[in-house]
Amino acid sequence: MAQKINPLGFRLGVTQNDRSHWFAQQRNYSKDLREDQKIRTCIENYVRTHIKSSSNYGGIARVEIRRKIDLIQVKIYIGFPNLLLIEGRGQGIEKLRNDVLNMLDSADRKLHIAIEKVAKPYRKPNILAEYIALQLEKRVPFRKTMKKAIELAEREEVEGIQIQIAGRLDGKEIARVEWDRGGRVPLQTIRARIDYCYYPVQTIYGVLGIKIWILEE
């Protein structure tokens, strides 16, 4: 039988890089790892709560974290950074920084947050998954949503994209899995620059699971 594996971990060190860059002593490793997860969750929740737009949730592609002795450097790769500055939200980054600092266990460390714009947002599966989730929450038919998402990705000149949605689609009583693909997506080729994300979305019919694979070459 085939063995399923996370496409990012499968290619780590070949075409994918780590998103946390630091070293820690053995007794502190698990603590720092949990702290990284808390930082990412805090950032994602802040963006979804404060800068949700009509077409996306702000578009976070990924969050990279670097640590020094008393400094934590966070770089947020975001598809639509202007949403942090419009509608009187000029202090959005500073408020986000304060929220993260309040969440951290130690108050004597410094935190630096940098924002970097993603040139082609819909080449990133996380941003595309947020778009799909928003459409499903609005009860847009899932097939129409998948085709539109593939069109958005193809406009960004991706080599291939595969989308899978699982759950009670269109409110049907029996859960099922549906997928669509555009271009080629060689999942078993380690050298293929495939980006991937899994994104759950809560609907009135239950939780739907969205999986997206994008070949960036």
Swiss-Prot record:
Locations listed in the record: Plastid, Chloroplast
Keyword DNA-binding in record: no
Main location: plastid
The keyword Acetylation is annotated on this UniProt entry: no
The KH type-2 domain, residue ranges: 47-119
Pfam families: Ribosomal_S3_C
Gene Ontology molecular function terms on file: rRNA binding; structural constituent of ribosome
Keywords (A to Z) from UniProt: Chloroplast, Plastid, Ribonucleoprotein, Ribosomal protein, RNA-binding, rRNA-binding
A GO cellular-component term linked to this record: chloroplast
GO terms, biological process: translation
PANTHER family, alphabetized: 30S/40S RIBOSOMAL PROTEIN S3, SMALL RIBOSOMAL SUBUNIT PROTEIN US3C
Family note: Belongs to the universal ribosomal protein uS3 family.
Cited HAMAP family: Ribosomal_uS3_B (MF_01309_B)
Subunit structure: Part of the 30S ribosomal subunit.
Protein name: Small ribosomal subunit protein uS3c
Protein's organism: Pinus koraiensis (Korean pine)
Gene designation per UniProt: rps3
